[in-house]
A protein has these predicted regions:
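Short loop->beta-strand "edge-of-pocket" segments that line small-molecule binding or catalytic clefts
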Residues: 18, 51-53, 80-85, 127
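Short, flexible loop segments at the rims of nucleotide/cofactor-binding pockets, characterized by
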Residues: 29-32, 61, 104-108
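Alpha-helix capping/helix-boundary segments
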Residues: 24, 58, 90, 116-117, ...
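Short, well-structured N-terminal submotif of metal-dependent ribonuclease cores
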Residues: 1-54, 64-74, 146
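Active-site neighborhoods of divalent-metal-dependent phosphate/nucleic-acid chemistry enzymes
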Residues: 2-5, 12-13, 82-127, 131
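Histidine- and aromatic-rich ligand-binding microenvironments
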Residues: 20-21, 55, 110-111, 132, ...
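Active-site-proximal, substrate-binding regions of enzyme catalytic domains
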Residues: 67-89
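Short, structured coil segments at secondary-structure junctions
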Residues: 79, 139-141
């Protein structure tokens, strides 16, 4: 494991948990050759210091890789992943960040759900574990982003 997740106890102090982004979950679920080891180790390390959290958007996006809800729930067990509702404030913040993104020339192909995930983490004082850190760092600068690059 690289130093990307160094000092987790300090970085997660005061955080309510770690929101786990879709790409990390899919890396592990699909045993993605490039990232499965990093993502699995990152999940294990984060779980030592804070609850792992998912929300309905993450659950929905991960669900496309599973045939049944039972298989999905086995992959994302409730005793490992805390399931949090989305706060209304996160919807407002997501919309504002998405609008700023579009005004900067961002393509509509980038889905609003990515912004909703970042907003959820920001509003609820969660860190986010992701491999796609650029957008989170740009539009949610106070968010604690845990990624291979940092």
């Amino acid at each position: 494991m690289s130093s990307a997740l160094a000092n987790l106890s300090v970085r997660l102090a005061g955080r309510q948990g770690v929101l786990v982004d879709i790409n990390v979950l899919l890396d592990v679920a699909t045993d993605y050759p490039v990232w499965a080891a990093w993502s699995g180790e990152a999940l294990a390390q984060c779980a030592e210091f804070a609850p792992l959290v998912i929300n309905p958007i993450i659950y929905a996006e991960v669900s496309v890789g599973f045939r049944t809800i039972e298989a999905l729930n086995t992959a994302l067990p409730g005793d490992t992943f805390t399931r949090c509702a989305l706060p209304w404030e996160a919807g407002f913040l997501a919309g504002k960040c998405f609008l700023a993104y579009r005004r900067r020339g961002g393509e509509r192909a980038t889905p609003l759900p990515d912004f909703y995930i970042g907003a959820h983490a920001a509003i609820e004082r969660l860190a986010i574990l992701t491999r796609d850190d650029a957008r989170y760092r740009t539009y949610f600068p106070k968010l604690e982003v845990l990624s291979p690059d940092r």
